[in-house]
Amino acid sequence: MKTTTRLLDLTAAMVLVVYVSFSPPLVSGEPGRRVSMTLVRDAAALGAFCLDGSLPAYHLDRGFGAGSNNWILQFEGGGWCNDIASCVERAKTRRGSTRYMSKTVVFTGVLSNNASQNPDFYNWNKVRLRYCDGASFAGDSQFGNGTSLLYFRGQRIWNAIILDLLPKGLAKAHKALLTGCSAGGLSTFLHCDNFTSYLPKNASVKCMSDAGFFLDAIDVAANRTMRSFYSQLVSLQGIQKNLDPSCTHAFFPEPSLCFFPQYVLRFIKTPFFILNSAYDVFQFHHGLVPPSADQTGRWNRCKLNVTACNPHQLDALQGFRKDMLGALMNFFRNSTRGGMFINSCFDHCQSALEETWLSPTSPRINNKTIAETVGDWYFGRGEEAKEIGCPYPCDKTCHNLIPASTSDFLASNASGSGHNSRGTHLTFLFLLLNFFFFFVISKFSKKDYVT
């Protein structure tokens, strides 16, 4: 299928979210627990395959003590593929095949079994669902042309993993939390109510999305890049039939809009928590300012260092935050069982690592960490757990992935561990990858490509 350069840019850029979302933890102190992979052997009978036809997988760390009947499931993130060429390439990597995945993963942050780092969930059964379908566990189709064979079976993978976990104790869960980061965070919006339907009626079941509230944004060139991308994704991978029917009916004749969390949110019945940065780095770089919307490179310096942004660019960033809060306002005002933590950091995924989830230097709003806010919401401690941070540059507790202040820039060039060790380690890679993408776009942005 023929796509615009705009979609090619976004597809290529997904490698950023792969690293940012689920890289090895960059934290000082004790390492997290390493957990082995479990292949879903019965998945083949359900037609549940990764893109390349390999079996899906998950990692299970058993709960103990008072948490032995409680479960937390985390969708892995890692972008999407919306056309045949990008899915063919993805199938040759760990994002499209369990053959290339690490057989063990480290559990940190909300999956940590350390009581001091994860006091509310440390002793629960913890599961990471490996991501290998390229469509947030939502597709149900396949493609074959005699040369390539691709399985778009994310929905079946989701079902197969749940069916594998039910006899292992999930069917008797007392408490459960479905969560995920990035593309996995988007998965929680798509599967939250379905998750609830599998569990006992008297179980306390809730869902939390981390960095998964992808906006239907208008970019700086007045295009809807993400809408175009998701529309092709929904069509290619046969997602429409798995979207919430109440939502697709409400948004007919554009059912693919229901892949956006802002549109499906009001149809979700299960209590929901939204963790997101109002200046999410992935959305800043590929929703608000995708390379195709800035072919002359006017935004290059700003995208790599927020202190280099001019007043017009800062206004656009503040406008993006305003749009995100606007999309969340009905939920903020009217959801009696919902929770939220919307800070003003240049970050992407904050529940997966100790230093942003719960540590002495974790991000805070009203002096509450993310872990404290989520715990208060889940267990009903105190008043409503809905926190919205003040706009950039007022938040001094951030772990920014790109420099957003003079202190961030100095930290990224300083030796040793500091307040922003995650940003320190990731800044160089982030800059390198972005310069690579800018180079590619400068070479090819004047043409359309079959991707």
UniProtKB/Swiss-Prot annotation:
Function statement: Hydrolyzes acetyl esters in homogalacturonan regions of pectin. In type I primary cell wall, galacturonic acid residues of pectin can be acetylated at the O-2 and O-3 positions. Decreasing the degree of acetylation of pectin gels in vitro alters their physical properties.
Protein name per its UniProtKB record: Pectin acetylesterase 9
The UniProt record lists the keyword Cell wall biogenesis/degradation: yes
Effect of gene knockout: Reduced inflorescence stem growth and increased levels of acetate in rosette leaves.
Signal peptide residue numbers: 1-29
Residues that carry a glycan: N114, N145, N194, N202, N223, N305, N334, N367, N413
Originating species: Arabidopsis thaliana
Gene Ontology molecular function: pectin acetylesterase activity
Membership in a protein family: Belongs to the pectinacetylesterase family.
Active site: S182, D280, H348
GO CC annotations on file: extracellular region
A biological process term (GO) from this entry: cell wall organization
Compartment list: Secreted, Cell wall
Record-listed E.C. numbers: 3.1.1.-
Presence of keyword Signal: yes
InterPro entries: PAE/NOTUM (IPR004963)
Pfam families in the record: PAE
The gene coding this protein: PAE9
Keywords for this protein: Cell wall, Cell wall biogenesis/degradation, Glycoprotein, Hydrolase, Secreted, Signal
Main localization category: secreted
